[in-house]
Amino acid sequence: MAEADLCTVWGDPIPGREKQAFNVYNEAMQYWAGLQQEGKIERFDVTVLAFSGGDMAGLLVVRGTAKQIDSVRRSKEFQQYIAHGQLVASHLSVARAYVDEGLAKFMGWYQKVIEQAI
């Protein structure tokens, strides 16, 4: 069961790199599908936003165990994937997230921190 997420958010393609951005997107979909087939992640979901004028154009959410997410994030392939993305998309960012059991643990920890701070 998933307990951790890896969220990648990106903005519009960098002007003049639209075609490259499209290719990087397609390669990323193959990369994540391969990891899912190999059992290295549980699943991934992609959302592309309608044109809004904002900084965010899309996001990808990868789900898995904390061990799976940490392993992927430390891999050479993932680092290269992010480097390619930074060359073609604006506002690219990656963050870990907590879901399901991981979220429950995080919120318990966070509540203790709040209680100690007050």
Language model: regions and residue ranges:
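Short S/T/G/P-rich N-terminal loop/turn motif that feeds into the first structured element of a domain
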Residues: M1-M56, G64-R74, V94-I118
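Residues that flank catalytic or metal-binding motifs in active/ligand-binding sites
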Residues: M56-G58, V88
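Active-site scaffold segments
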Residues: V61
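A short linear boundary/processing microfeature
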Residues: S75-Q79
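Conserved short beta-strand edge segments in small beta-sheet-based binding/regulatory domains
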Residues: Q80-Y98
